[in-house]
Amino acid sequence: MAPSQKRKPADDFIFTIDDDDELPIEEEEVVAQPPKKKAKTAKKSKKSKRDASPEEDDDEDAVEGIWGFNDDDDGAMDSDFEFGGDETANDNGVEDFEGWGFEGAKKGMRVEKAGVDLDEIIRRRREKKLGKSTENATAEEKADDAEAETMDVDLDDDDDEVLADDAFGMNVASDAEESGDEKEEDDEEEQESGVEVEDDDEAASDNDSVATPTNHPDDDASDASDDEEDAEEEAKRKAFFAPEEENNPDKKATASSFQTMSLSRPIMRGLASVGFTKPTPIQAKSIPIALMGKDVVGGAETGSGKTGAFILPILERLLYRPKKIPTTRVVVLLPTRELAIQCHAVATKLAAFTDIKFTLAVGGLSLKAQELELKLRPDVIIATPGRFIDHMRNSASFSVDTVEILVLDEADRMLEDGFADELNEILTTLPKSRQTMLFSATMTSSVDRLIQIGLNRPARVMVNSQKKTVTTLVQEFVRLRPGREDKRMGYLAHVCKNLYKERVIIFFRQKKDAHRARIIFGLLGLSCAELHGSMNQTQRISSVEDFRDGKVAYLLATDLASRGLDIKGVDTVINYEAPQSLDIYVHRVGRTARAGRKGVALTIAAESDRKVVKAAVKAGKAQGAKIVSRQLDSGEVDALQTQIDEMDDEIDEIMEEEKEEKQLAHVEMQVKKGENMIQHEAEIKGRPRRTWFESEHDKKKSKQAGRDELNGMREEMKKKTGKLSNKDKKRLDLKQLRAEGGGEWRKGKNSEAEMKARHKEAKAKSQAKKAGDKGSAPKSKGKPKGKGGKRR
């Protein structure tokens, strides 16, 4: 056996006392040793304590520090660190977490040239106009100063006209400051008095509340059909969905915290990092069912944590996946790019302490970068339907044969006619033996549509999802009297300049309205950004980030931003006009008052919006929400509208200049494209042609079907005839009611089925009568014979 003194300290992992006797250990080397080695040394020394000499014991007692001699702290561990529970996670997470970002999307963002800078165009025009007005103003100020030395200030009618001209021109900001205090006091009085819908008994004027709509024959006729539950549909639901007893066998045991759900430690760390300590009701009900591998149809109010309800069980199941071969096992589909980007951010935050890989596949981002990521076979793909089909058909080495879980977020939107063909293409390609989960704030109850997804006895988990808003939301309505519909923009400008001045999302039905409002706000000096489908992805992300970071006060958006978008600190939502349906209204106003916070939703409604407003007020009353009428000064509104009307020529010039710059940019792009075609002709022609599952004609047809379902064909008829009469509106409402199949036929006393049967019977009788006439009296050919008999 070799003697111990020949060993070197660097060759041994554990040092013995004999080694220490022969080879003295330097202090620097001991201090540099990691804690693991020191712990093992301590264990060894305990075993050999009996053989140690008193001098050696004294030497060991001298080492009192944790890391080495002299107790020098090397800063490896924070002295204030504590293993915290719920309180620590809550304190650290909620205060430090700043919301969901777009880092995942920026990685795959294509390098694009900056588009037309609308702010720069507006700024140039304002400076030009301000330059002229300041020259006139300085001359007037000098004259006023000379007069002020000799005479007192007298506000007569002439002076009032001069002040009105100043206010009417470029002194917009000063007007807002002067009237701001008065308006704030009026707002506080209205909030304290709580101008409730039920107490609105004032005389008819422009300031009357829209929250108490007058009864209408169509409304009275449709109320009964809306409230009644179709027995046949209810029977279908019972046969389609799994019984509630199977979904939740132990109803008493409701999860009060994530610890009781037996989630893995990495997921618990991810939850603590974002400040999630207690599950929301939808999460407490759906996560245990999803962990069992069952299909789920979930619905809950906006801002209730539906994304976490399907992300958490997915992460928990993927922790136990086979890891030898990378495999794509989960696909999450969402209707809009922004919602998919946000879902990707939520998932990556929650999975920060796991080895689960995610890929974002949405339109507007680099196709090649996404293809490279898909070749690595990530565990989860978060995508929009169009881009997912593109990769499914055209990306090499990408297969969906191993997909085990499919999630449709905002499922009711995905089931509409606009997405029907794309969704059908995806569902027929994915494996049949999969777990499917559907979530939305306004989940459809139509079994016929849910059957298309291929669900297998799904568990129905509904938590306050019957088209309800949260109770912390104050809903305000501003009524436009007949004849004042053309002053809608004046009402909006008055609200934004005097009432709600920051963190406001304004929704429009059409892109052109949002863009025009963007120009008007710029001319009025209101900082804003727009968000709609005509913008490229870089511009869309930039607009959301500017609004989120507080660089702009208003976000002018279409319904592109109405679903799922979670922007921290949104105080107010304004509807420029009431949306097409109550479902869209619920999603719009759900951008504020999220996760228990307070918020305000204001809707500018005219007589044509009566039906949706009535439904919103009725739903709000049913759940005890606060419905408030907002009264505005018609004089100030008219003044603002006049100011906006006088801007029409300037607005048209700005839009024309913007159009010219876009055309120039397009020509430059075409020139660059031609140069690339010449330089890289062989490579471009050698690429395989990308394919799609439907023709251009089918694409247009599906888009039109989506528009018709959304607008109820009203907009198309408006384009043809200019304006819809009350008769046309009633006819379209009845047609929509029949198409939905949710109510009875109200035109007569008989049901629709009976009337169809009667019509069919009458048609059959008519055909039989015609056939009988043909058989009994055949038509004679030639001229009729004369009365005199045959000729001889």
Swiss-Prot record:
What this protein catalyses is: ATP + H2O = ADP + phosphate + H(+)
Q: Where is the Helicase ATP-binding domain?
A: 287-461
Q: Name one GO molecular function term.
A: RNA binding
Classification via InterPro entries: DEAD/DEAH_box_helicase_dom (IPR011545), DEAD_box_RNA_helicase (IPR050079), Helicase_ATP-bd (IPR014001), Helicase_C-like (IPR001650), P-loop_NTPase (IPR027417), RNA-helicase_DEAD-box_CS (IPR000629), RNA_helicase_DEAD_Q_motif (IPR014014)
Which key words tag this protein in UniProt? ATP-binding, Coiled coil, Helicase, Hydrolase, Nucleotide-binding, Nucleus, Ribosome biogenesis, RNA-binding
Q: Give the PROSITE patterns listed for this entry.
A: DEAD_ATP_HELICASE, HELICASE_ATP_BIND_1, HELICASE_CTER, Q_MOTIF
From the UniProt entry, list the residue stretches annotated as the region Disordered.
Answer: 1-100, 125-258, 675-792
Q: Which GO BP terms apply?
A: gene expression; ribosome biogenesis
List the subcellular locations: Nucleus, Nucleolus
Q: Where is the Helicase C-terminal domain?
A: 491-635
At which positions is motif Q motif?
Answer: 256-284
The Basic and acidic residues compositionally biased stretches are 675-756
Residue positions of motif DEAD box = 409-412
| A Pfam entry, by short name | Helicase_C
Q: Which residues form a coiled coil?
A: 633-681
Q: Where is the composition biased (Basic residues)?
A: 35-49, 757-768, 780-792
Q: Spell out the GO cellular component terms annotated for this protein, sorted alphabetically and separated by semicolons.
A: cytosol; nucleolus
Q: Which amino acids does the record list as binding ATP?
A: A300, E301, T302, G303, S304, G305, K306, T307
Statement: the UniProt record of this protein carries the keyword RNA-binding: yes
E.C. no: 3.6.4.13
Known partners and oligomeric status: Associates with pre-ribosomal particles.
- Function description: ATP-binding RNA helicase involved in ribosome assembly.
Domain text: The Q motif is unique to and characteristic of the DEAD box family of RNA helicases and controls ATP binding and hydrolysis.
Which family does the UniProt entry place this protein in?
Answer: Belongs to the DEAD box helicase family. DDX27/DRS1 subfamily.
- Protein name per its UniProtKB record: ATP-dependent RNA helicase DRS1
Q: Which organism is it from?
A: Gibberella zeae (strain ATCC MYA-4620 / CBS 123657 / FGSC 9075 / NRRL 31084 / PH-1)
